[in-house]
């Protein structure tokens, strides 16, 4: 029992580092997609930011083979679109070219999905369009996702009334009732 308590701060510190890295990579992917795929001109500050981030990610580690990733390691909870529903999983590894998610079942290579991740501590949610680049069967399965589209980073809040409201603004809230 004592051993698990000592390990807890290390795990939360590691997860904090992963979230910071994800935040940086989402900004890199956003600028890269806007510049390369969408043809949207970047202003001077954004061009400098993209070049700086490119230097950072180019110097980072290469993606590890799926066989070397420990699926029992604690990850960050995520959701993936799969067929007509959602698939829960955990983000296990993260590089600028790939995200590795452990899930109950694999997704076919080439399948396009959207990964959703929310950080309750900072109040930030990420929506990342991806394509399945590789997968490994097992329990749990490991799915390698390649970023494929414009990611979205946004803040979320809980209404002060504590009641959820339709995103279309339809219906009454607890205050109006």
Please provide the spans of the model-predicted regions.
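Short beta-strand-centered aromatic/proline hotspots
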Residues: 89, 126-135
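N-terminal helix initiation/capping motif
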Residues: 1-94, 160-177
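Short, charged beta-turn/beta-strand-edge "cap" motif at the junction between a beta-strand
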Residues: 118-123
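A generic structural motif
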Residues: 95, 132-136, 149-151
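A structural signal for short, hydrophobic beta-strand segments that form beta-sheets
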Residues: 91, 132-133, 144-147, 176
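Short solvent-exposed strand/turn elements
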Residues: 107, 140-161
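Short strand-loop-strand
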Residues: 72-117, 139-145
